[in-house]
Amino acid sequence: MTEIRQEMYKVILYVQNAEKSGIDLNMINFVCRPDINGNIFQLTEAIARGRAKEALRLLNILLMNKEPLPLIRFMFNRHIKQLICAKELQNERDLIKQAKIHPYAAKKLMQQINSLKMSDLEFLYHQCFLSDWQVKKGLMEDRLSFETLLIKSSLTFANRS
């Protein structure tokens, strides 16, 4: 609720300073920061369906919206960990209680795990680790490493279909 209040405050300040007479959807999209969580769900879905091009498009949207790549990487890694927890627990209530995940996110995670096997999630987690390691060791630039992660994972899933 606090985040919504802050975003509304930004829109109101923008309207006042730009001397606009009203608020429209374009103005909200211009001023407000999009929700990264929804994009991370979509990014994971694109990978699981073997759609590298879609995964890269979603990454570019996040980057164009000025989301920092380390945050995107962190959110993606966290999402994979949450999917592993969801797969292990197999119960929305347990996921909410034990992993302390918001009920809406838990519901979406439970839906997303239906199309993924535990071995798929372990593969993704390992790819996240390797990508992060390459960056920290200076073997690869951050963006290239993450794009490679998306492409390699997507192609692996595409070849399984």
Label every PLM stretch briefly.
Residues 2, 64-67, 137:
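Residues in soluble alpha-helical coiled-coils and helical-bundle/repeat scaffolds
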Residues 1-45, 49, 133-135, 142, ...:
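Non-catalytic interfacial helical region
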Residues 109, 125-135:
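Short helix/strand-capping connector loops at secondary-structure junctions
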Residues 1, 118-121, 140-143:
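Generic detection of long, well-ordered alpha-helical segments
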